[in-house]
Regions:
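Catalytic core of DAGKc-family lipid kinases
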Residues: 40, 80-172
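Short, flexible micro-motifs
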Residues: 15-17, 69-72, 93-97, 149
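Short secondary-structure transition/capping motifs
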Residues: 38-39, 59, 63, 67, ...
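ATP/NTP phosphate-donor binding region
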Residues: 1-62, 72, 76, 108-111
């Protein structure tokens, strides 16, 4: 099964995309693994890419390189491909999914993401209607409504301001 890294360059405080890509290529060459790379360009792009990839090529091991939002998009995009596997390299602000594992895991290890054993994980399926259009999606660690959504929206806005990044955006 091919491993495909989906990289969100806007995750966390901004990912050094070229450096990450170089490291992924270096590790995959060492492991003699054929990998794919996709750098997202906008919100929703990770979901769209994973879905289209599955429709064209079938199952893959997708590695979401970003935060919880990127991971959620990849899970939603690959949701109709039952043999797809999902991994994560945490680059986001909170990385709540990864922090929920007591042992910490090898989430930051590119080699472990390529060679690791997969295990099943429960997901949350949600359905909503927005502007008259139905949407079904999936998330892996939490689903928020109300106040939490307002905080997340305000945090995203704060992170766009100069000198405000990471956890500081949540405090403000």
């Amino acid at each position: 099964m091919k491993t495909v890294f989906i990289i969100n360059p806007m995750a966390g405080q901004g990912t050094d995309t070229e450096k990450l890509i170089d490291k992924i290529k270096e590790v995959s060459l060492f492991l003699n693994e054929d990998i794919g790379l996709h750098v997202t360009s906008a919100p929703g792009d990770a979901e769209r890419f994973a879905k289209e990839y599955c429709e064209i090529h079938g199952a893959a091991r997708f590695i979401a390189c970003g935060g919880d939002g990127t991971l959620g998009e990849v899970v939603s995009g690959a949701s109709e491909c039952p043999d797809a596997q999902i991994g994560v390299i945490p680059l986001g602000t909170g990385n709540d999914f990864c922090r929920n594992f007591a042992q910490g895991g090898d989430f930051s290890s590119i080699a472990a993401q390529i060679e690791g054993e997969s295990t099943k994980c429960d997901v949350i399926r949600y359905c909503t209607t927005l502007n008259g259009k139905e949407k079904t999606g999936y998330c892996v660690n939490m689903f928020n409504i109300g106040f939490d959504c307002n905080v997340a929206d305000m945090t995203a806005s704060m992170k766009k301001k100069p000198f405000i990044s990471g956890s500081l955006a949540y405090l403000l």
